[in-house]
Amino acid sequence: MTTIDEALAMLDPKIRKRLGPAVGIKTEFQPTPSPGLNAALGGGFPYGRQVLLWGSKSSAKSSLCLQTIGLAQKEGKLCAWVDAEMSYDQEWAEKLGVDTSQLIYSEARSVNDMVDVTVALLHAGVDLIVIDSISSLLPAVYFEKDSTELKDLDRTKQIGAESKDLKHAWMMINYANNQEKPSLIIAISQARNNITP
């Protein structure tokens, strides 16, 4: 049986630099206001990950995220809110424990806007980013080429455009999430009606 050291010694030195024993790898968790959810998640939402918070309309997804931001701020974490729904309410956020003077806020109307803002926030060292909600983001197919001008509706019918753009978005965001100082990204999404029989 080959040992770890023997296996690593057989590898190319460039690859060997990136490998090692799987010890000392720890995940930090951000507690939520829900003890039950924290227990189910092993301590809360994990840093260094992308979390999808999905549910029906008005099921307190945004409120849970705002309360989680408030808890993170009390731990000294820098937080951001990317608003695609245009539904952020400063007064409500403050009632839920958010220090809004220390919360970075940005609007995002398209998937491209969201990626640009989120990647910039990750590079700036923001600890926790909430995107509310990915269901409201327009895919690139809705815009004229290299423009923010919307196309006519009849030229936007491309099956899977939103899914395709979001897939690429999450790949870029995952790559930008620095594992030396991992951030937590929470994306909110809404359940849609099933239109099939």
What is each PLM-predicted segment?
Residues T2-S106, M114-H123:
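The Walker A/P-loop phosphate-binding site
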Residues S63, A108-P197:
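P-loop NTPase motor core
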